Amino acid sequence: MGSEMCIRDRHKYGSELLVDVVELKYVKKFLAKSAVHTLNYYDITFITEGKGAFSVDNQTYEAIPRDVLFSKPGEIRNWDTHHITNGYALIFEEEFLSFLFKDSLFVQHLSFFQIESSSSLLHLSDELYTRILETLHDIKMEIDSYQQGDVHVLRALLYEVLMLLDRAYLKMTSIEEGRSREVSNNHVSKFMNLVATHAKEQHSVQYYADKLC
C-alpha cells in the first residue's frame, strides 16, 4: 500500500511560518481514504484522548493518553484514527531552529530524532504532560497573534518543549539500558555460580545453557 504525502502549508497564517500546533481531530480530515502517510516535516504527536495502534516506519506502538510519538521527514506513519480520538501535533521544519545554533544539525542531534534512537515513543509523567500541554497552548496563542518576522517567542517556546522532551527521553533510555545491564549481570553471576558448583562433574556447555534458561 502506498502512503499519502502530507505537505505542510507554510502560508497557512498568511506569512510564511515554519511551526504549527494542530489538533489530531483536525488532521484526520486531511488523511483521505488511508491513514498511511509520509511527512515532509518534523512531527511530535501528543495523545490526549483514546488509545490505539500508532506506527512509525514499521514500528507499531499501542498509544495511550500521555504518549508522545516522534516522526522525522520521510518516515511512513499510520495510526488508528477511529480509536485515537484526539491529541496535538507539534510540527516544524528544521530551518526554523537550526540557523540559530552553531550546530546546523541541532534538530537531528536531539535524542529522539537520532537515526539510532531505540524508540519513537515516550510516555510522559503527569507533571511533564501538563507542563508541555500548557506550553503547546502558549505556542498556539503566539501563532494566532503572529506578526510577520516576529518569531523569537515561538522559537523559545519550541526550544523549551524540545529540551524537556529530550531530557525525558534520555532518562527513559538510561533506565532501559540499566535494566538491560542488570539482566545481563544477573546472567553472568548465575553462570559463574553454576560453574563454581558443578565444574568438576559437568563440562558440557549445553548443561549450563539449559540451567540459565
Which positions does each model-derived feature cover?
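A short glycine-rich, His/Asp/Glu-containing loop-to-beta-strand
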Residues: 9-29
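N-terminal regulatory/effector-sensing and dimerization cores
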Residues: 22-114, 147-151
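Short, Lys/Arg-enriched, Trp-marked, Pro/Gly-tolerant hinge/linker segments that flank
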Residues: 124-126, 144-154, 165-193, 197-211
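A hydrophobic/aromatic-rich effector-binding and dimerization subdomain
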Residues: 8-16, 80-141, 171
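Short, small-residue-biased leader/transition segments that mark boundaries at the very start
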Residues: 1-6
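Amphipathic, well-ordered alpha-helical segments in soluble domains
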Residues: 43-46, 131-135, 157, 161-164
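Bimodal feature
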Residues: 59-65, 130-134, 149, 154-157, ...
